[in-house]
Amino acid sequence: MSPIFDALVPMVVEQTSRGERSYDIYSRLLKERVIFLTGQVEDHMANLVVAQLLFLESENPDKDIFLYINSPGGSVTAGMSIYDTMQFIKPNVSTVCMGQACSMGAFLLAGGAPGKRYVLPNSRVMIHQPLGGFQGQASDIQIHAQEILTIKNKLNRLLAEHTGQPIEVIERDTDRDNFMSADQAVEYGLVDAVLKHRGE
């Protein structure tokens, strides 16, 4: 079960011609093509997000999907499964940061459809290089160290593509935790606009 469903989840009751039908709030919003990516990015959560993306594509391949992000980041491989699916499916995926989009959360935010990446005004965005820790034989540690450097270079290259920043700037700015306000995230190219009110 996803952590989002561990707490009490509100139910929405709809009147239909066949009587009443109740949905949990997230399932009801899924009908409106809204997906929530909240909390730590990990395999189970990523599988749920990927499944929802694929389902919404099958429902209507020409209508935008809205991915709301409030995440401190997490697993690179789990995040990349979401990212690759966002790029793979036919519908545009519009990303919206609410609260925070850090690390892999920021990467997914930037990976939304060009011109359709948004941030709410009091949200924070943070980019940095991937983290990892290893133990074991020296040769294995060396292999893992090389792998994390390969991942770092790949993430930097993709961030450069999505932001329009030179790769050298991305490498410098992700060397340490780099926090940005909503306006700074727009200026940097991680998102396209700050949304203060619906309809903007």
Swiss-Prot record:
GO terms for biological process: protein quality control for misfolded or incompletely synthesized proteins. InterPro entries: ClpP (IPR001907), ClpP/crotonase-like_dom_sf (IPR029045), ClpP/TepA (IPR023562), ClpP_His_AS (IPR033135), ClpP_Ser_AS (IPR018215). Keywords: Cytoplasm, Hydrolase, Protease, Serine protease. It comes from the Bacteria. It is found in: Cytoplasm. GO terms for molecular function: ATP-dependent peptidase activity; ATPase binding; serine-type endopeptidase activity. Gene3D superfamilies: 2-enoyl-CoA Hydratase, Chain A, domain 1. Transmembrane segments: none annotated. GO terms for cellular component: cytoplasm; endopeptidase Clp complex. The keyword Lipoprotein does not apply. Its EC number is 3.4.21.92. It catalyses: Hydrolysis of proteins to small peptides in the presence of ATP and magnesium. alpha-casein is the usual test substrate. In the absence of ATP, only oligopeptides shorter than five residues are hydrolyzed (such as succinyl-Leu-Tyr-|-NHMec, and Leu-Tyr-Leu-|-Tyr-Trp, in which cleavage of the -Tyr-|-Leu- and -Tyr-|-Trp bonds also occurs). The active site is at S103 (nucleophile), H128. Cleaves peptides in various proteins in a process that requires ATP hydrolysis. Has a chymotrypsin-like activity. Plays a major role in the degradation of misfolded proteins. NCBIfam families: clpP (TIGR00493), PRK00277.1 (NF001368), PRK12553.1 (NF009205). Belongs to the peptidase S14 family. This is ATP-dependent Clp protease proteolytic subunit. The lineage of its organism: Bacteria, Pseudomonadati, Pseudomonadota, Gammaproteobacteria, Vibrionales. The gene is clpP.
